[in-house]
């Protein structure tokens, strides 16, 4: 019927059954309960683990009916089929990630360029997509605030609270397989991995300079815009970098 009666309380996305909703919720919490017995990699759902495990076994059960080429997953086969049908797919030239929808592709590209076209009219903060802006607006409206029991800090959704709470517990569930460093968030692990690979996927659209971390690109962009968002509460002096503000604060 196409009915999707189950709603994610974090982002409002709809699902046809509770099992898919539960898998989706892990994208907010960062939970990855399924572990590969061969390499130790973690996954949010069993189906992704099964596809990954075929990389170890060499199993490729999904065959193209046009040329009989085999793939480890149906999604890989479907992407390949477009080469026969002429259907469009959108590939990121920076990291190679493939998208079937232009809207998803455009949002992803902004993660590399640092472009944030959706601006909050209340405080001026910008975001790469409208859904992030809508979540942020809850800070101003006070909608559905959840509070940390340790320090009283408020959050718009529980996934942010769960990540914040690791500051108090010291939990760092994401481990680098190269050097063993532990991190509190998945995106921190992803950006840390670029240091080992030598990759710099975040590029300034003004001058072409590349960075391994998104916030380095954001701070760099202030040099072009002249913006100084980090302000000293003592004297009002503004800075383009948080580290410069911290160094300045010692003078007071």
UniProtKB/Swiss-Prot annotation:
GO MF terms listed in the record are: DNA-binding transcription activator activity, RNA polymerase II-specific; RNA polymerase II cis-regulatory region sequence-specific DNA binding; zinc ion binding
Gene Ontology biological process terms in this record: regulation of transcription by RNA polymerase II
Identify one Gene Ontology CC term for this UniProt entry: nucleus
C2H2-type zinc finger segments: 6-28, 34-56, 62-84, 90-112, 118-140, 146-168, 174-196, 202-224, 230-252
- Where's it found, cell-wise? Nucleus
Entries under InterPro entries matching the protein: Znf_C2H2-type, Znf_C2H2_sf, Znf_C2H2_type
Say where the protein is mainly found.
nucleus
Key words of the record: DNA-binding, Metal-binding, Nucleus, Repeat, Transcription, Transcription regulation, Zinc, Zinc-finger
**Role description:** May be involved in transcriptional regulation.
The record's family statement is: Belongs to the krueppel C2H2-type zinc-finger protein family.
Identify the PANTHER family for this entry.
C2H2-TYPE DOMAIN-CONTAINING PROTEIN, ZNF44 PROTEIN
Q: Report the protein name in the record.
A: Gastrula zinc finger protein XlCGF28.1
What is the originating organism of this protein?
A: Xenopus laevis (African clawed frog)
Its lineage opens with: Eukaryota, Metazoa, Chordata, Craniata, Vertebrata
